[in-house]
């Protein structure tokens, strides 16, 4: 079966899907409202299924890739949820000590796509650690709908503490140089912005279509930032002008790019919103940014 692309859907359906993914409407509401945009003989429920992630087809680096060593690791988050879990990936050969990258998932916890992102970074010479924010609720449940519902039950303040603790855990590993950056997607992109405020030791922050922090918090940012925005993303982009003004006013080092024609989630190659050209360019910029700030 040929994989669908964003262009195969009407803008109205993609907007409804974005609302569904972010918990603004239920599955039933999506089906009811998307029915107006289906073609004869197709159901809105079937339409939704084509928009959901295909983790097998979208995988880039296999779980058992012999070039890597991967493991599940636990760490303490005393100011957050307590005992947390995550996925650690590193090259099987090469330098004993490597710079670290914290990989922060979307609003569904540590799913196979984010584990794949960690493996991709490990192949680039990083110690990549992807925490699972759903650990206190049993971890990623293997189902995106269930994961989304669980995520809404998490304490937002504790969440930030869990990722601060993850940064500290990664930076303190014996095989980490102590230079640690962070990359996040959607919820994770917003968390990168929050970590930039909370963690002065953050070596570099890369946010893919992530929510911004309030302007009054920007003076606390010490890390250089790389910010990727989708051209078609009203919800996230609405906060960008004020954020950019605050970054400039406070002399924060940053790069920002808007990928025209790309939808929110354009880097996620497991869904039709994936935009290969935008994702390739954003990923190349991300790797160059980490090289400049973490490997020097």
PLM region spans:
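Gly/Ser-rich "nucleophile elbow"/oxyanion-hole loop immediately N-terminal to the catalytic nucleophile
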Residues: 144-183, 293-295
């Amino acid at each position: 079966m040929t994989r669908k692309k964003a262009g195969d859907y009407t803008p109205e359906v993609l907007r409804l899907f974005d609302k569904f993914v972010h918990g603004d409407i239920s599955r039933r509401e999506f089906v009811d409202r998307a029915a107006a945009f289906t073609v004869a003989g197709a159901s809105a429920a079937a339409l939704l299924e084509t928009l959901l992630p295909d983790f097998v087809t979208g995988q880039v680096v296999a779980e058992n890739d012999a070039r890597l060593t991967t493991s599940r690791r636990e760490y303490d988050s005393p100011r957050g949820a307590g005992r947390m879990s995550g996925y650690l990936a590193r090259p099987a050969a090469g330098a004993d000590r490597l710079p670290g990258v914290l990989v922060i998932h979307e609003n569904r916890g540590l799913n196979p796509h984010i584990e794949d992102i960690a493996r991709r970074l490990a192949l680039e010479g990083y110690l990549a650690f992807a925490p699972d924010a759903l650990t206190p609720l049993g971890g990623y449940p293997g189902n995106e709908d269930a994961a989304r519902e669980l995520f809404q039950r998490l304490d937002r303040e504790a969440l930030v503490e869990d990722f601060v603790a993850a940064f500290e855990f990664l930076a303190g590993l014996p095989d980490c140089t102590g230079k640690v950056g962070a990359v996040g997607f959607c919820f994770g992109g917003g968390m990168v912005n929050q970590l930039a405020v909370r963690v002065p030791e953050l070596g570099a922050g890369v946010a893919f279509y992530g929510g911004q922090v309030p302007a009054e918090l920007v003076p606390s940012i010490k890390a250089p930032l790389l910010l990727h925005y989708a051209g078609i993303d009203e919800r996230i982009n609405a906060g960008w002008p004020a954020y950019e003004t605050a970054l400039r006013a406070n002399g924060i080092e940053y790069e920002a790019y808007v990928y025209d024609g790309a939808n929110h989630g354009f880097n996620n190659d497991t869904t039709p919103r994936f935009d290969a050209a935008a994702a390739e360019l954003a990923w190349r910029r991300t790797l160059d940014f980490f090289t400049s700030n973490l490997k020097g």
